[in-house]
Amino acid sequence: MFPLYLVRLLYPIGLIANLFFGFAFTLQWFLSERHKRACVPKAFWIFSSIGAILMIAHGFIQSQFPIALLHGANLVIYFRNLNISSSRKLSLKTTLIILAVTLLLTALPFALEAYYHPNMQWMASPNIFHLPLPPPNMYWHMIGCLGLFTFSCRFFIQWCHLEMNNQSTLPVLFWQVGFVGGFLAFLYFIRTGDPVNILSYGCGLFPSIANLRIIYKKSRLSEFHNPSYFISAGEASGDTLGSDLLRHIKALHPDKRCFGVGGPLMRQEGLEPLIHMEEFQVSGFLEILTSIFTLIKKYRKLYKAILKENPEIVFCIDFPDFHFFLIKKLRKCGYTGKIVHYVCPSIWAWRPKRKKILEKYLDTLLLILPFENELFINSPLKTIYLGHPLVKTISNFQHCPSWKQALAISDQPIVALFPGSRPGDILRNLQVHIRAFLASSLAESHQLLVSSYNLKHDQTILDLLEKEGCCGKTVPAMYRYHLMRDCDCALAKCGTIALEAALNQTPTIVTCLLRPFDIFLAKYIFKIFMSAYSLPNIITKSIIFPEFIGGKSDFTPEEVAAAIDILANPKSREKQKRACQTLLETMETNVVTVQECLQTIHSLKSRFHTENDCLGNYVQKNVRPSF
């Protein structure tokens, strides 16, 4: 069809075409390995289309009619995959017409050449390296034609899958047929000594093997989940939430096996511990660093146990950084059960990109703050607002009027201080609190009581009171709600304690004296800039409690004292109490009970139950579980 010198000169077109095919399948393989499922990006079809156009040209130049014809048909299928998701989607009838015209136009030049040159070869063997190979016999040509036909049928299979599911994916049969056809064609072109096609079909075996390997590994997970729940809590607050969750699970499903990670409260409710929660209790950079290998070992133990047991639902309670690693690993290993995270990470304050992780890997997110629902209005993630556990705890609190007598506290009016639970927080915030109290108008008429989170902190508090020349007493943390109910006003460190004060309707001023390094991290690394920082103010979207947050240059004890003087006015205190009542009503609105929540979760199907793009119905019907 073309002069011999031109045939040899243009031979590299086939090599360039294979570079495009190779890049397309390398990209597809890379994304499939990354996501542990067969992914088909749009770029796959674009690069394959360019490769097909070049291979059609190669088929014409090298007088290889089957190559040109099959790649012409494939080109139409590539186009159909690109067109299926466009706004101008063509009908199936139009696509079939395009296919027929393409095949006709491809066959026409060969037909004309055969008419004028009856001795032309329909499948020439270039053998550009002049290897001493005898011409292949009829049986080799039959193997070659069978291989090429089978190999090309994979895209017709994919096309049928595309039209039936209206989704551009590569089903498992695509890879199986591609491997068989590619292997036969590979043998044929070795026999004929055609370097381009040896490279093309030899490299073409790799994507089929790689994707079949991914599918096989994924199919080892049973679609039928065992009637059990995995529940994990890594902190004391999570242990409290987990015990309540377990209590309701056992009420609904008494025979349900629950295993995982939990503390004493969860174990009392029947959790079968794989690891005790106390083993995760590490704090501080050095302690975490020295325990890193132990933590990794525990992490590996957990995800392997979950994959082996294959429970219906995985519940992860708070402790987000560890649980995110676990959740991502489970999904990447093919776990298709429901994953529920209890307590939304503070994405509204910092690291907002964590929202994408939640949406990508979870089925349901259980919320404890009312405004968090607004963060997921247009999200595919199912959210359920359970309410904050403190609301129930404080509503059930029974105030004992004789608590002051038990601690030998006089009936003098009280200003309460809640400087924090950590030694560093106590030293920084308590000094500001004491100086603000002494500078206020209440210093002469009120006594000062400091809530102590731990008995071992009492002496630190008393030493600081003495150093500042202030008389005061410590009150154990178990009496903190009594203290909140009976004080005229409180100074509280920004944190959960501020929400506790609001739910107890305690007139409060929020403070938080930060270290320079903390300020640097907040401003320049984590970029935490908010209109309010304490939960009562965030929830109500108004300033219930005055806030003094920052470094020593941002506020002074005298400014805090001025706020105390405002709260000395009964009208100001009453205004704060009314705002706290509004806060309580907000937090009690649209609350779903744990029992209703569990029923909803149980009724929903996991978003990850069936991976149509990887397994389709094949795995569901043909692959038996290995566990």
From Swiss-Prot:
Pathway: Bacterial outer membrane biogenesis; LPS lipid A biosynthesis. It comes from the Bacteria. GO terms for biological process: lipid A biosynthetic process. This is Lipid-A-disaccharide synthase. Its EC number is 2.4.1.182. SMART domains: LAB_N (SM01259). Residues 1-224 are annotated as: Unknown. In the C-terminal section; belongs to the LpxB family. The keyword Transferase applies. GO terms for cellular component: membrane. Residues 225-627 are annotated as: Lipid-A-disaccharide synthase. The keyword Membrane does not apply. The lineage of its organism: Bacteria, Pseudomonadati, Chlamydiota, Chlamydiia, Chlamydiales. One of its GO terms (molecular function) is lipid-A-disaccharide synthase activity.
